[in-house]
């Protein structure tokens, strides 16, 4: 199986995503995670743009040097004589990715220079960088349109580059305009005409970045540029997870990337960048490992009839079955098994009917809700733990405080707490009563698109207990109340699950 190299540009091109800015700490965290996952090289930033960028490059190169990975760190630089090369060297990096013009139109319009003048400027920059110990790769920006509109320019420029001490020529579909077949044709021409190492740098404007990248490899490109979650300008760069898995499964092209790290990397970059992958994104999307149809759950139970090679466990995830109105008994059975509870066929049917009823009402049912629904359906006791009242004190310069009135099996009691925020105060008040609360893993607030201040918000909180994750949700116009209600569902989930376990033990 042929192995392709992968260069990740989440920290450089990915930071050009509107609204995305990384701190030096964040860049270091992401760079470490990428390199530990087997990425061949990481482009960590651009020369000269800010002192914060310089700090990030210094810290990343210091870490890389101590882990024998300095040659895997790359920085974008410009055709500016000595400035970019000096900046990169002063901040500890050894590799300059030099941005040049891959189309005559860009050369003449943006630089106001002739092709000959541009090549002379490139020669001066490359020669200086090389003499000062830097490895130089050269980006051909807008190469795709250069090949389409003036191939002679591209060939003449590349012929000039071939005489210089450069390691790679990086072919850019800057505006994402190529088809896979055009990509293959253009890359093959470059590969056949020049004895150079070629990278392909794709963009996803037409949704073809992954396909174009694979066809570039087929034509002779040895390294592909990617970004985690497809971050980048406009529609983004080639998606790391989709590229690696598609190349292996469908084209027999392996990489050094650890597939089990893909979900972790996606979550890490999403959390830091604030840009979530689409819910149904291949490999890493929130619902991409969820089967929604009861027929599919039944087929998987009987013979894995609806599973392909994209087993979620390959990527550090697990398969699950949705609890909506298209669910079936197999969906119920699977989720109960995941929760470690056994219920009778009659209870399964009653639970399925309730799930479908809620689905018709557009209510999202989580796996943890099964416990609460079973309690509502079959228990004669009043619902376990209730939040009867709450009073928050919020004053400038003082920590938020809360006084709670709770009821547990008809017994009323109070709890108080203060914290860094109102929800933190609420949690600390609960911990004063329930010391063994599960670990809060993830907290998300979603707001409807009505565009009004009174729009409903949904709190989605993920918890960990006994090594297992579960999620609770609640909806309210006030996001704090939504979060508190989701937390109360967590308390009742734990309480009712304990009751079910006791009942099952008593029967045996």
Where are these regions (language model features)?
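Mixed-charge, glycine-accented linear interaction segment located at domain edges/termini
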Residues: 469-471, 475-504
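Short, small-residue-enriched loops and turns at beta-alpha junctions
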Residues: 13, 17-18, 46-52, 103-105, ...
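Catalytic alpha/beta core domains of metabolic enzymes, predominantly
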Residues: 175-178, 185-301
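Alpha/beta enzyme core
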Residues: 4-6, 16-42, 62-63, 67-68, ...
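Non-catalytic terminal/interface segments that mediate subunit docking, oligomerization
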Residues: 16, 29-30, 35, 364-482
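A mid-to-C-terminal "edge-of-domain" accessory segment
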Residues: 3-4, 8-10, 251-416, 453-456
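N-terminal active-site wall of soluble small-molecule enzyme domains
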Residues: 48-67, 73-76, 80-85
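Short beta-alpha connecting loops at secondary-structure transitions
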Residues: 107, 225-233, 245-257, 315-321, ...
